[in-house]
C-alpha cells in the first residue's frame, strides 16, 4: 500500500509535468519497464531516484520531497518484514491478494457460487482445495497449508484491528453441497455465527430476485485507511485474476456492488434464509 501511494504520487507529478516514461527512465538511467513498476508500487525505490525524478518533474517543495522519501523508507522496511502469508502455496496473484487483504481496513465482496474465503470453515476450504477444477493441490500436506492460510486470514475478523466485511452472496452458493451435506451444514452454521459480528454485514441475493447486475462473476473491493488511497478491485476471470487500481473503474465496481446489495435481502432476512437452507440439507 505504501509503495502504491508513492508510485501514484510520482505518476501524478510526471503527468503534471507532461513528461513521458521514456524521459523519466533516462533521468535515472533505467528502462521504461522500471518506471512502470515504480509508478505501480511494485518495486522498492532508491532515494537518489526519487530526488532525481522530483527535480525533473519540477517539485521544488522540500517538505513534499521529504515526505516522499519517508514513504519510500517505510515501504522498504515493510518489504523486508516477511508477512505470514509469504509461506503460502498459493499462486503469486493470490498471495498478493492475501497481503493486500491484510493491509485493508474494509472488504466488500460479491460471490456467485462459493462462500467468501473469510467465512469458510476448515472442512469447506479443504473440500474446495481437493475439488477438480477448483483447487490445484494434490499433496495432503500442501492442502493443509492452504487450509491453514485461509483460517489465518480470518483472524482479522476478531483481531486487534477488526476488518470490516460487507459480503453479498448469491443463494446458489448456500445450496451447493461443497464437501457433502455434513460439511455444508457446518458451513451454514458458521455463516450464522459470523453474521452476529459487529464488523460483518452479510446479505443474500435470493433466486426470486431474478436477474441482477453482477452476472459477470465474483469480485472483491479492498479499501484502505491511508489518505487519498484508491480502492483496489480484484475480479476473477476464467483464466486469471484481474486487478483494478484506478479511481473511475473501482468506483464503477462500487456502484455495481451497491446496486446488487439493494436487490438482496436485509441481513435479518438473509440470516433466516440461511437457517432455512441449513434445516433443509
Language-model-detected regions and their locations in the chain:
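Interdomain hinge/linker segments and adjacent boundary elements that couple functional modules
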Residues: 2-8, 22-26, 40, 44-175, ...
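Alpha-helix N-cap/helix-initiation motif
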Residues: 3, 16-17, 180
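Short, amphipathic alpha-helical "recognition" segments used to contact nucleic acids or chromatin
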Residues: 10-14
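Short alpha-helical DNA-recognition segment
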Residues: 17-36
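A ubiquitous short alpha-helical element
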Residues: 34-39, 238, 242
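C-terminal regulatory/effector modules of DNA-binding transcriptional regulators
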Residues: 161, 168, 174-281
